[in-house]
Amino acid sequence: MLVIPAIDLMGGEAVRLEKGDFATKTVYARHPAEKAEEFARAGATLLHVVDLDGAKAGWPVNLDAVRAICEVPGIEVELGGGLRSLPDIEKVLALGVRYVVLGTAAVERLGLVEQACQRFPGQVRAGIDARNGEVKIAGWLEGTGLAAVDVARKVKGAGVGLVEYTDVARDGMFTGVDAAGAARIQAEAGIPVVASGGVASLDDVTACRAAGLAGVIVGKALYERRIDLAAAIRAAAA
């Protein structure tokens, strides 16, 4: 199982939010690429990057920071946030991004998801963010009335090969990851799922591994030094 460290970008800096609330920003690194280097040294092979400004704007914003992160050797990058057109997807892939994570587009523009999967096979993932079971979009600011498992089924039908599921209510709160909810989506939709949101300790990593998930995304727990990344990677492989 993969342990995927996260970098959230705002104003070119690495930040973290609580429950996706833009008013709770904490800056952790002025130069996000240095964080990427640190994670690569610890043994991570994939980095989860979110362009928070892009998620609000509807198009990629932090391109300079993304480019710098992609230039870090030894670690691949997946990027989400504001990717809602084929030209924007193409633009970030050209920067060196390995996978794109479509969130709002996965809900509102399934046709775009299908086109992206056909044009960039194997490089398109879906980010499904939910609060109390309801999928949220536009940087978690808008509700949809849709259930996460239903969206997962639809994106699988569109050609997506993996879903990244975030419990927004847990994100940045150290309340424990929703491994059971992620496993339920994986089983019912028949698609590999990576869990995110609320990871607080190595117990969360082992819970995701025990649930048979494809991976777990770890963010604030790394920045607050609650989890040692190298130890988490070892726990996921045990």
Curated annotation (Swiss-Prot):
Active-site residues, record numbering mapped to chain: D8 (proton acceptor), D129 (proton donor)
Keywords per UniProt: Amino-acid biosynthesis, Cytoplasm, Histidine biosynthesis, Isomerase
Pathway recorded for this protein: Amino-acid biosynthesis; L-histidine biosynthesis; L-histidine from 5-phospho-alpha-D-ribose 1-diphosphate: step 4/9
Listed transmembrane segments: none
Superkingdom per UniProt: Bacteria
Classification via InterPro entries: Aldolase_TIM, His_biosynth, HisA_bact_arch, Isoase_HisA-like, Isoase_HisA-like_bact, RibuloseP-bd_barrel
One term under GO cellular component: cytoplasm
This protein's name: 1-(5-phosphoribosyl)-5-[(5-phosphoribosylamino)methylideneamino] imidazole-4-carboxamide isomerase
Cellular location(s): Cytoplasm
Record keyword Amino-acid biosynthesis present: yes
SUPFAM superfamilies linked to this entry: Ribulose-phoshate binding barrel (SSF51366)
Signal sequence interval, chain numbering: none
GO BP terms: L-histidine biosynthetic process; L-tryptophan biosynthetic process
Reactions performed catalytically: 1-(5-phospho-beta-D-ribosyl)-5-[(5-phospho-beta-D-ribosylamino)methylideneamino]imidazole-4-carboxamide = 5-[(5-phospho-1-deoxy-D-ribulos-1-ylimino)methylamino]-1-(5-phospho-beta-D-ribosyl)imidazole-4-carboxamide
Family: Belongs to the HisA/HisF family.
EC code: 5.3.1.16
A Gene Ontology molecular function term of the record: 1-(5-phosphoribosyl)-5-[(5-phosphoribosylamino)methylideneamino]imidazole-4-carboxamide isomerase activity
CDD domains associated with the record: HisA (cd04732)
A Pfam family the protein falls into: His_biosynth
Gene: hisA
